[in-house]
Amino acid sequence: MRTLRGPLRQPVRRLGLPQPLVVSVHGGDVRMNPISGTFRLKGHDDPEERKQALLEFLADEKEIYELFMVVDEELKMMCDICNEGGQVLGPFLKPMTHLVHTEYLLAGRTSRDVRDVLRDTMYAATVTGSPVENACRLIRRYESEGRGYYGAALALLGRDPQGRPTADSPIVIRTADVTVDGDLKVTAGATLVRDSDAAYEVAETRAKAGGILSAFGLVPRATTDSDAIAALARDEDVLLALGSRNQR
């Protein structure tokens, strides 16, 4: 395991929820999944009020350009590794237990070694900032202690039935680090841009941590019906609002 601040030496156990994709390579097909922008479900129990709040979120300039920033950074990575071209799909919604994210899917073709692809897609801009290299320098300069596993590079390497190399690498977020002494640490962050509101971003980090904390019984479980949220993600007005983002 290698982290943003180098190798991690403290013995810990990592427990977590399903992780968002950073990059995958299968048969030369490359996928990246830039994610940014967070709609908190808490406080939106009425279906109509929830829909209206989501539509306002999708039209929010700050949320739009926050995702664009991450997409732009990962597109630069894709342009470097995908010598056979690619495409951008989305935006889409990614419903979670306590929140809903906005995301794109980037797809392309490469002939490069999967290990090179992994190296050149470290680290996800949504957990470092942009440009990634400069952001990592600032993290090293201003953060007094390491982030542990949070935002680290994790990968599963293998081969497909035809013997071709494969790789799947997620963002290590929404996890809990548990030490041998039983201490538990959950890390969450938010993407800051010019129009960010400090109080809103703090509430966002609490919502992000809520999923893993509720799994441990440390905070109440989400009360929102997951089927209702999935249906909202397919709502025509919501789909139109998502599509209109690409007209900017």
Residue positions per predicted region:
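Cytosolic ligand/metal-binding cores
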Residues: 24-99, 179-232
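General beta-strand structural signal in soluble alpha/beta enzymes
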Residues: 3-6, 16, 32-34, 69-71, ...
